[in-house]
Amino acid sequence: MARTKQTARKSTGGKAPRKAVATKARKTAPPVGGVKKPHRFRPGTVALREIRRYQKSTELLIRKLPFQRLVREIAQDFKTDLRFQSAAIAALQEAAEAYLVGLFEDTNLCAIHAKRVTIMPKDIQLARRIRGERA
């Protein structure tokens, strides 16, 4: 990469320069090779980025093996020694994730209606009650 010459840029405001007296009051010089603080994004920035990322994607968000164990555990209550095709578990997972995404969309609308941005258990209960899933 070729090096380029730096040109001076006009300042666009920001903090006012500190007085020279304040720098002389310091007893020790700052460390030359100090530890650099890790970069942190402002609150909400990463959340918005994740929302956009997951809205674009179509892959399943629940891990396959834990979901498979859960399905088998629930099926044990109805009949022992049940066997599942892999396509059956994939279909169950697809349906379960679609249901959860829809429920969270409705839950978010309930929270927004209550003039909040944070979803709460009462929002999920209201969304399910409006849907007619729970009386």
Swiss-Prot record:
GO cellular component terms, semicolon-separated: nucleosome; nucleus
Low complexity: bias regions: 19-31
Subcellular location: Nucleus; Chromosome
Lineage: superkingdom: Eukaryota
Pfam family, one: Histone
Chain segments carrying region Disordered: 1-40
SUPFAM superfamilies listed in its UniProt record: Histone-fold
Main subcellular localisation: nucleus
Keyword terms: Chromosome, DNA-binding, Nucleosome core, Nucleus
Keyword Transport part of the UniProt annotation: no
Example GO molecular function: DNA binding
Matches recorded under PANTHER family: HISTONE H3
Subunit structure: The nucleosome is a histone octamer containing two molecules each of H2A, H2B, H3 and H4 assembled in one H3-H4 heterotetramer and two H2A-H2B heterodimers. The octamer wraps approximately 147 bp of DNA.
Function: Core component of nucleosome. Nucleosomes wrap and compact DNA into chromatin, limiting DNA accessibility to the cellular machineries which require DNA as a template. Histones thereby play a central role in transcription regulation, DNA repair, DNA replication and chromosomal stability. DNA accessibility is regulated via a complex set of post-translational modifications of histones, also called histone code, and nucleosome remodeling.
Family as reported in the entry's similarity comment: Belongs to the histone H3 family.
The protein's name in its UniProt record: Histone H3
